[in-house]
Amino acid sequence: RNLTHNYADPRWILQPSCGETLTQIAKAGLGLDMVSVMSEHSRAIVELADAHPDLKIVVDHMAKPDVSAKAWDEWAADMAELATRPTVYVKHSGLNTASGQGWTSRDWQPYVDHCLEHFGSQRVMLGSDWPVSLLAGDYVGVWQAQLETIAQLSPSEQDDVCFKTAQRFYQLDLS
């Protein structure tokens, strides 16, 4: 997992010195997790996907929208743009730490719905963000809230989001 937000340059992964490593990750069929906590990170992921069209990328924490401030426009545009790249996926995780005190699944629903609308259930996966998630909730409460946000999906779509998307992305053999 790449912690992009720990670097001063949000485009650092686009440096030529990273190119060969990214090519090898793609050749091995592996995926790259990217943390995006601001629009500049999301735009860099778009560039990364364009530069390495065979590289599977998952954007952790739905690019960390500021749920507590009900921030929407820039985040929604970034996610819609990311979704146009077929090798970019999104992880439904970490929203509780972006939601302030007293959050509920209703606070997250528009963000989840937007990602499902643009990425589809086959490119959205659940994640725990444990132990960081404990900063703004308990494990069971966060997990239950995440499941509530996908309750409207068909059983097949829920299977995608709950495990099949991650199984495909990370090449997990569950047999």
Summary of predicted features, one role per range:
Residues I25, H61, V90, D129, ...:
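Conserved, mostly hydrophobic/aromatic
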Residues R1, V58-D60, K91-S93, R123-S128:
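Active-site neighborhood of phospho(di)ester-bond hydrolases with catalytic His/Asp-centered motifs
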Residues P10-Q15, M38-P53, S68-E81, G102-D113, ...:
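Distinct, well-ordered alpha-helical segments
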Residues A26-L32, P53-K56, T84-K91, G120-V124:
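Short, well-ordered coil/turn segments that N-cap beta-strands
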Residues D113-H114, H118-M125, L134-S175:
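Mid-to-C-terminal alpha-helical segments outside catalytic/metal-binding sites
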Residues R1-E40, E47, K70, Y89-L95, ...:
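Active-site gating/metal-coordination segments in enzymes
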Residues V37, A63, L95-N96, P131:
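Catalytic metal-binding/acid-base residues of hydrolase active sites
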Residues D66, T97-G100, L134:
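Short, solvent-exposed loop/turn segments at secondary-structure junctions
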